[in-house]
Swiss-Prot record:
Primary site of residence: cytoplasm
Metabolic or biological pathway: Amino-acid biosynthesis; L-histidine biosynthesis; L-histidine from 5-phospho-alpha-D-ribose 1-diphosphate: step 6/9
EC number assigned by the record: 4.2.1.19
Tagged with keyword Cytoplasm: yes
GO terms for MF: imidazoleglycerol-phosphate dehydratase activity
Disulfide-bond pairs as recorded: none
Enzyme class of the recorded protein, top EC level: lyase
GO cellular component: cytoplasm
Swiss-Prot/TrEMBL keywords: Amino-acid biosynthesis, Cytoplasm, Histidine biosynthesis, Lyase
Short name of any one Pfam family annotated for the protein: IGPD
Protein name from the UniProt record: Imidazoleglycerol-phosphate dehydratase
Annotated localization: Cytoplasm
Length: 195
C-alpha cells in the first residue's frame, strides 16, 4: 500500500496530511482558504489520490506560508509513499481542457527539484486566493517531492478556469508518473541506479 502520514509543524503552519496514492479520489481538506481547498479537492479527485489534509496557518499575516507549506508537505508525502520508486512510470503528462481553457502539465519524479509554471492569470485574486501563490504551491510541491513540475496554460479567458485546468492537468500527469508498470516491477526507472 503506497501510503504516507505526515505532520509538518513550523512557527507559521501546522499541517497534518494523510495520503493514499492508489486511492479513489476521496478527500477531507481544510486550509482556511476556500478556493485553495477547492483546487486541492480537484487535485485529489482527478489524481484518484485519497487525501486528508488539515492546515492551520498564519492567515492573519498572509496566505503565502499556508499555500507553500501545503505544497511542500504534499510533495514530501508523495516521496514517502512512493518509497524507492521501483516499478513506477516516473514521468507523466496530460493535456486538460476546461471549457475555453487548455492546460498542459508534465511531471518527472526524477529526484531533482525544478519547476516552470505559466498560468497566464491576469488578476490578483480568484475567490479568496492570492493568485501569485499558485506558483508557490507548485514550487513547494516540486521541492518537497524532488520532482520536475511543468505547467502551461495554452489559452483561456476565465482566470478561475486557468487555475482549475492547471491543477487538474497536474493531478493527472502525477497520476501517470506514479502508476506502476508490471513489466518493470523490480526495475528503477533510471540508468543512474537511484532517484
Amino acid at each position: 500500500m503506497r501510503k504516507a502520514t505526515l505532520d509538518r509543524n513550523t512557527a507559521e503552519t501546522k499541517i497534518h496530511l494523510e495520503l493514499h496514492v492508489d486511492g479513489k479520489g476521496k478527500y477531507e481538506i481544510s486550509t482556511g482558504i476556500r478556493f485553495f481547498d477547492h483546487m486541492l479537492e480537484l487535485f485529489t479527485r482527478h489524481g484518484a489520490f485519497d487525501v486528508t489534509l488539515r492546515c492551520e496557518g498564519d492567515l492573519d499575516v498572509d496566505q503565502h506560508h499556508t499555500v507553500e507549506d501545503v505544497g511542500i508537505a504534499l510533495g514530501q508525502a508523495f516521496t514517502q509513499a512512493l518509497g524507492s520508486k521501483m516499478g513506477i512510470l516516473r514521468a507523466g503528462y496530460f493535456v486538460m481542457p476546461m471549457d475555453e481553457t487548455l492546460a498542459v502539465a508534465a511531471v518527472d519524479l526524477s529526484g531533482r527539484s525544478a519547476y516552470a509554471v505559466d498560468t497566464k492569470v491576469k488578476v490578483r485574486i480568484v475567490g479568496d486566493l492570492q493568485t501569485e501563490l499558485v506558483d508557490d504551491f507548485f514550487e513547494g510541491f516540486s521541492r518537497g517531492a524532488l520532482a520536475n513540475v511543468h505547467i502551461k496554460v495554452m489559452y483561456g479567458r476565465s482566470n478561475h478556469h486557468k487555475i482549475e485546468a492547471s491543477f487538474k492537468a497536474f493531478a493527472r500527469a502525477l497520476r501517470f508518473a506514479c502508476a506502476k508498470d508490471k513489466r518493470l516491477a523490480k526495475v528503477l526507472p533510471s540508468t543512474k541506479g537511484l532517484l
